[in-house]
Structures are given as structure tokens and as C-alpha cells.
């Protein structure tokens, strides 16, 4: 399945070519000359992306510390398909140019011409980017843009565990709230329990950040005991401690897998498709709110409070989308969902056909309270509010039209 199909049966496809132009060619300077330190990279015309095949793939893997491969279906003969593939290749070329000195390589694997290589490498999903680092294979499930891809690969190059050794690093750790995070307290890097933790971190790197400390003062502030690991759900203030310390790699991985779907999670460019594919029975509860907007901020704070009060409910998971993070998708979302994203919204979306139903705000001046949101969410979870209800309303409208005939 193509990446663009995932947000509602090819619904994003009409935006993709325009998006690719912007992402590759960049924002025009409008006559202003670039200043030193603010020159955005422009493609220099050097071919760095390699067509990976049966003859060269072993040498390509030996050459790079990290290798990103776009596994693609052959472009069709029509002009639009050819142009789109060229733009995708340009995104890879620009990313390869930026990361050339970092030891990151880029390649293309054709699903028909290079099927044997794809099979050996375990490439299965067309139009996906697979990242190879050592023995790890990471499927990139984010926005296909040069800047997002570069940022992701820079994270891949980092160690899977970040050490906290002082007050500033501890403050930075505590400021992370919009994603899952783990932290463990160990005796030293040579500890077998730290090594198990490090191996577990590699399984989720770079999507889930793992932190560790060997400093007893830092551990005391975090109320961590030796060999203890705390798991923080996104937007939650209090952690869960992984039971039965010290933990093996398998125990840590199992715990994270069981708890990785947060009650409230943010849709991010670098992991947007992974998040969207992780639905509950074919639906998502989706909230749109601009954090920088006063109403959006207030609505988001209410969402956080509701999530914190209901974190024990495994059936509740809300995806928060900040429209500012996806400006080119705002017109598509407004048209598809028939909503106004200049104001906060919360609704239920069917991931198969993008059908949706949205909470009615009784008074546009007053945002829903935590109690009103909880009541609405309870109705959703009990099936009293669902996208089929909206279909029934549409059918009734159609019947009325037929009667008029």
C-alpha cells in the first residue's frame, strides 16, 4: 500500500505533487539574498543516490554506516507519474547531499527489477523508506520530505540511550511531554542490566527516547532505585515503573509494546503514518488544536486533563493534530471532514473511508469543559456516537431529495 493511501484511500494524492515541489525546491526568497548562516541547501546536481541491485548491494552496505533505501514500484509511463518519481528522487538527493559527511547513504530499490535484492533485504512495503544501521532495520513511517527525513536520520545516528548526568539534562528530560519516554538508573555502563536496557532501546530507536543515569543524585530526584526503569506515557506526569527489577531486554520490550499506545498522542511528521495505522477497531478519535492559539491551547489543556483522568482505560486513545505542523493538509482536512480548523475540533474518523462525525459545540464562544468532553468520549466508546450515524443522516437527506423528485 502506498504511503499516501494511508490517510484515507489515496485522499492525500492530489496534494502530493505540489507538496513535493515545495519540499524539494524550497520556499522562494522573494528577491532577498541569503545571509551567511541562513543559506538553505540547494541541490548541487551531483548524483549521490544509488540504484541498488544484485551486483552492487553488498558493496553499498559496506560503504555506509547508515543506509536509507526507498523501495518503490516502477513509475508508470504517464507524465504525472514520471514527474512525481523524479521529485521523490530529488528529495533523496537533497537529503543525501546534506548528510554526505555523516556517513549516510541513499539508494533506490525497484520492486520489479530488483525483486531478488528486496527479498534478501526484507523489503516488503512499496513506497517505503527502510533504514539500515548495523543489524537494525527501521521502517521510516513519516512525511516524505527532505527536512523531516534528514532530522529522522540524524536521530538514527545518535546512541539509542541518552545519558543524564546533571541538572540541565534532567530539566530537558522533564520538559519532554508529547512523546513516550523511559529512564533507568544503573550502576555503570558495564552493568549487565544497563546493557539489557540498551539492547531494548535499539528495538525502538529512534521513535521512543530512552534515557539513563548513573548519578545517584539524579536518581533520587526521579525517585528511582538502582536498576529500576520508569515508563512515562505521553502527556502524563506520573510514570509507571516496570515491575520485577532488574529487567531483561525481553521484559522491557514487552512492557513498552503493551503500553506504547498513549491515551493522548500527537501526530508528528516523522511518525505520522505509524500513528495513523495504529487505530482501534478501524476508527480514530481525532482532536485538532493549534497549541499557539489561545483557544487551541485551552482545549489542549482540557484534553490533557481528560487523558490523565482516563489513562487506565485501554480503549481510549486520542490523536492530537496541531494544524500548524501540517499546513498543506489543512485544506484537505477541512474539505474531507467538513470542519473549520481555525477553531478546535474533536471527532471520530473512520480510517478506511475517512468518514467522520464531530462534536457539536453548543456555544462557539465557550469550549467544552472536561466533564462535557468525558461525556462525549464515553458516548463514543459505547458506540452511541459513530460515523455510521452520519451516514444514516446522509441517507435520509438522499431520501428527501428522492421524494422531491
From Swiss-Prot:
A Gene Ontology term for the protein's cellular component: I band
Pfam family, one: Calsequestrin
Entry-annotated residues carrying Phosphothreonine: 124
Region (Disordered) location: 382-405
Predominant location category: endoplasmic reticulum
Modified sites of kind Phosphoserine: 81, 216
Post-translational modification (record): N-glycosylated.
Gene disruption phenotype: Mice are viable and fertile, but have a lower body weight than wild-type, due to a reduction in fast-twitch muscle mass. Fast-twitch muscle from mutant mice exhibits slower contraction kinetics and requires more time to achieve peak tension and to achieve half-relaxation after a contraction. Fast-twitch muscle fibers from mutant mice show a strikingly altered structure of the calcium release units in the sarcoplasmic reticulum with a strongly increased number of ryanodine receptors, plus narrower sarcoplasmic reticulum cisternae.
GO biological process, one term: protein polymerization
List of residues that carry Phosphotyrosine: 43
Residue positions with a glycan: 350
Membrane topology: Peripheral membrane protein
Protein localization: Endoplasmic reticulum; Sarcoplasmic reticulum; Sarcoplasmic reticulum lumen; Sarcoplasmic reticulum membrane
Cleaved signal peptide residues: 1-34
UniProt keyword annotation of Acetylation present: no
Keywords: Calcium, Endoplasmic reticulum, Glycoprotein, Membrane, Metal-binding, Mitochondrion, Muscle protein, Phosphoprotein, Sarcoplasmic reticulum, Signal
UniProt keyword Cytoplasm, yes or no: no
Superkingdom classification of source: Eukaryota
Tissues in which the UniProt entry reports expression: Detected in skeletal muscle (at protein level). Detected in skeletal muscle.
Gene Ontology terms, MF aspect: calcium ion binding; identical protein binding
Family annotation (PANTHER family): CALSEQUESTRIN (PTHR10033), CALSEQUESTRIN-1 (PTHR10033:SF14)
Function: Calsequestrin is a high-capacity, moderate affinity, calcium-binding protein and thus acts as an internal calcium store in muscle. Calcium ions are bound by clusters of acidic residues at the protein surface, often at the interface between subunits. Can bind around 80 Ca(2+) ions. Regulates the release of lumenal Ca(2+) via the calcium release channel RYR1; this plays an important role in triggering muscle contraction. Negatively regulates store-operated Ca(2+) entry (SOCE) activity.
Subunit structure comment from the entry: Monomer; increases in response to a depletion of intracellular calcium. Homodimer. Homotetramer and homopolymer. Can form linear homooligomers. Ca(2+) ions promote oligomerization. Interacts (via C-terminal end and preferentially with the monomeric form) with STIM1; this interaction increases in response to a depletion of intracellular calcium, decreases both STIM1 aggregation and clustering, interaction of STIM1 with ORAI1 and store-operated Ca(2+) entry (SOCE) activity. Interacts with ASPH and TRDN.
Protein family according to the UniProt entry: Belongs to the calsequestrin family.
Protein name: Calsequestrin-1
Organism: Mus musculus (Mouse)
